[in-house]
Amino acid sequence: MNKIRKGDEVIVITGKDKGKRGVVLAVGENRVTVEGLNIAKKHVKPNPMKGTTGGVEAKAMPLNISNVALVDANGKPSRVGIKVEGDKKVRFLKTTGAVLSA
């Protein structure tokens, strides 16, 4: 069970974007892509077959999953725990104890 999932609001705790918040767009093996953070400029070749024009576009690049933390209701970073309720595993915030949606 992944502790951080697509759609979670996270805050960056280390790196050039430290303190910034965003929503998780994608989760990989050990990496997460966060909307509007860790932006890099990628050069794109024009492709007349697809109808794309060339140029330089800004793209959100993945961050290491250890560099982000979930945001609790108070707006502070929180670690995530996993506990069993009934027959299902649920995620909860360690700062407030609030259960996250399954």
Curated annotation (Swiss-Prot):
Gene Ontology biological process terms from the UniProt entry: translation
One term under GO cellular component: ribosome
Keyword Ribonucleoprotein: yes
Keywords: Ribonucleoprotein, Ribosomal protein, RNA-binding, rRNA-binding
Molecular function via GO: rRNA binding; structural constituent of ribosome
Database matches in CDD domains: KOW_RPL26
Gene3D superfamilies xrefs: 2.30.30.30
UniProt-listed PROSITE patterns: RIBOSOMAL_L24 (PS01108)
Ranges in a coiled coil: none
A Pfam match: KOW
Subunit structure: Part of the 50S ribosomal subunit.
UniProt record similarity statement: Belongs to the universal ribosomal protein uL24 family.
Function: One of two assembly initiator proteins, it binds directly to the 5'-end of the 23S rRNA, where it nucleates assembly of the 50S subunit. One of the proteins that surrounds the polypeptide exit tunnel on the outside of the subunit.
Protein name per UniProt: Large ribosomal subunit protein uL24
Organism (species): Paraburkholderia phymatum (strain DSM 17167 / CIP 108236 / LMG 21445 / STM815)
Name of the gene: rplX
